[in-house]
Regions:
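C-terminal accessory regions of radical SAM enzymes
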Residues: 143-152
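Short hydrophobic/aromatic beta-strand or adjacent loop that forms the aromatic wall/cage
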Residues: 11, 136-141
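Acyl-donor binding region in acyl/amide transferases
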Residues: 29-133, 143
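Short amphipathic alpha-helix that is part of the acyltransferase structural core
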Residues: 1-9
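Short, cationic low-complexity segments
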Residues: 152-168
Length: 168
């Protein structure tokens, strides 16, 4: 079970099998925020953006995660700009993304969201039945899944600075 405990939008999902038993899954889908798509590489490229939104492994053996991510990217349609996040609250740095040559583009700002009394995120104003829930900073990674020429072109259109990988 994934720690986020919510079902994201899933457009593509790939499994990792060991002796015909599912032991891992990676999924990709539309990012929750349309403004995120536009913010990454502009209006012209917003439909190319997808999010690696879940990665779950039963055993989490050495290199298992990066192998699953790397092989699944090869199965995605091109060109795509893949964005994913490593949650600092979970002590994630993003080593999987670093191992699969994602580009590090900084860390989001911590913030608070409005949630209902049950603690779940709400996009609706619920009056006094709401509370503020802390959302931790996340490391943002992107991967340009395209041929060499398209990749070079898309890299020039990325709106974020490419930075050194974070380490812990």
């Amino acid at each position: 079970i994934h720690y986020a405990k919510r079902m994201p939008s899933i457009s593509y999902a790939y499994g990792l099998f060991l002796n015909n038993i599912l032991v891992g899954i990676v999924s990709y889908g539309s990012p929750v925020s349309p403004s995120l798509c536009k913010g990454i590489a502009g209006e012209i490229n917003k439909k190319k953006v997808i999010e690696l939104n879940r990665l779950v492994l039963k055993y989490n053996k050495k290199n298992e995660a990066s192998m699953l991510v790397g092989k699944s990217i090869k199965l995605l349609p091109k060109p795509k700009i893949i964005v994913s996040y490593a949650d600092t609250k979970q002590n994630h740095v993003g080593y999987i993304y670093q191992a699969t040559n994602f580009l590090f583009t900084g860390t989001t700002k911590p913030r608070t969201d409005i949630a209902g009394k049950n603690g779940k995120h709400s996009r609706h104003h619920l009056g006094d039945k709401t509370k503020r829930v802390f959302r931790s900073a996340k490391h943002r990674y992107i991967f340009i899944n395209a041929n060499k020429r398209e990749r070079k072109k898309l890299l020039k259109q990325i709106n974020y600075q490419i930075m050194e990988y974070p380490k812990w």
